[in-house]
Amino acid sequence: MKQKTIKNKVELVGIGLHKGVPVKMELEPLEVDSGIVFYRSDLGVSIEFKAENVIDTTMATVIAKGEAKISTIEHLLSAIHAYGIDNIRISLDNEEVPIMDGSAIGYCMLLEEAGIVAQNAPKKAIVIKKSIEIVDEKKFVRVEPSERTIFDFKIDFNHPVIRQQHYKFTFSTQAYKEEIARARTFGFLHEVNYLRSKGLAKGGDLSNCIVLDESSILNKEGLRYKEEFVRHKILDAIGDMALLGMPLLGSYISFAGSHKLNHLLTKQILSDEKAYEVVSLEDKVEEAALDYAFLHEQH
């Protein structure tokens, strides 16, 4: 299995979820071993997508270099990771990634439009060798050794539409597009009002977020999946775990996990040499374990 990048440069214009201002985003190919690099075109500053560059995980994952920051990156990174792209430059002329429809499906379509090409170097992956867990009261995130890449997530909300939800996702690109990519971010009406009073969620509305009042959802079209809420948590987790710098080969298990806990988990994994092994994905067994099924791959 080879490293991959996109074939052609693509771009779009959207708005940021929290600041609500227009932003132009361009995706460009990068050479082998470049990794994922963000670029603030308005400031002329590049920011590598690495765990040590994360500065905030309160409402979204935010990375920075000096005064330059980029926020709400997790949905885009989720799609990039799910499509097996190792090397790509993401240029933005403002500080937020466009929110699109609150899910990752728009990014998937953009990546398919760009095309995906194999490069002349082997893809690498992080194989989990022992269990590592981050706990915050009842909440936890954990990775365990596994022959397949699995995301197993549970949530429990005191709300009649959500309540307890559980979803176990065995990773493949096609399954991601069908089962995970269309799950939207969600929030509660009382939280939206509070966030806006703090200058946040200015770009959020029913076109890019599931909004719930005390007893129901306000979106007239309803849900895209029965378990859309927990599926979106998996979407977020896939994007956050991309902070490892290469694909995860192991099981991710969580109850009520968050961006903060995911970030702490990636840092803990990378700080423990006995927790993981970096392997070259040239073995067919390892390749099958990740199952990047590229319907749109071009050579």
UniProtKB/Swiss-Prot annotation:
Domain of life: Bacteria
Any single GO CC term annotated in Swiss-Prot or TrEMBL for this entry: membrane
Active-site residue list: H259 (proton donor)
Reactions mediated catalytically: a UDP-3-O-[(3R)-3-hydroxyacyl]-N-acetyl-alpha-D-glucosamine + H2O = a UDP-3-O-[(3R)-3-hydroxyacyl]-alpha-D-glucosamine + acetate
Binding-site residues, Zn(2+): H75, H232, D236
Record bears the keyword Transport: no
One Gene Ontology molecular-function label: metal ion binding
Documented EC number(s): 3.5.1.108
Record-annotated membrane-spanning stretches: none
EC class: hydrolase
Entry's Gene Ontology BP terms: lipid A biosynthetic process
Gene3D superfamilies in the cross-refs: lpxc deacetylase, domain 1, lpxc deacetylase, domain 2
Biochemical pathway: Glycolipid biosynthesis; lipid IV(A) biosynthesis; lipid IV(A) from (3R)-3-hydroxytetradecanoyl-[acyl-carrier-protein] and UDP-N-acetyl-alpha-D-glucosamine: step 2/6
CC cofactor: Zn(2+)
InterPro entries associated with the record: Ribosomal_Su5_D2-typ_SF, UDP-acyl_GlcNac_deAcase, UDP-acyl_GlcNac_deAcase_C, UDP-acyl_N-AcGlcN_deAcase_N
Keyword Cell division: no
Keyword terms of this UniProt record: Hydrolase, Lipid A biosynthesis, Lipid biosynthesis, Lipid metabolism, Metal-binding, Zinc
NCBIfam families according to UniProt: lpxC (TIGR00325)
Its job: Catalyzes the hydrolysis of UDP-3-O-myristoyl-N-acetylglucosamine to form UDP-3-O-myristoylglucosamine and acetate, the committed step in lipid A biosynthesis.
Family as reported in the entry's similarity comment: Belongs to the LpxC family.
Protein name per Swiss-Prot or TrEMBL: UDP-3-O-acyl-N-acetylglucosamine deacetylase
Organism of provenance: Helicobacter hepaticus (strain ATCC 51449 / 3B1)
Gene that this sequence comes from: lpxC
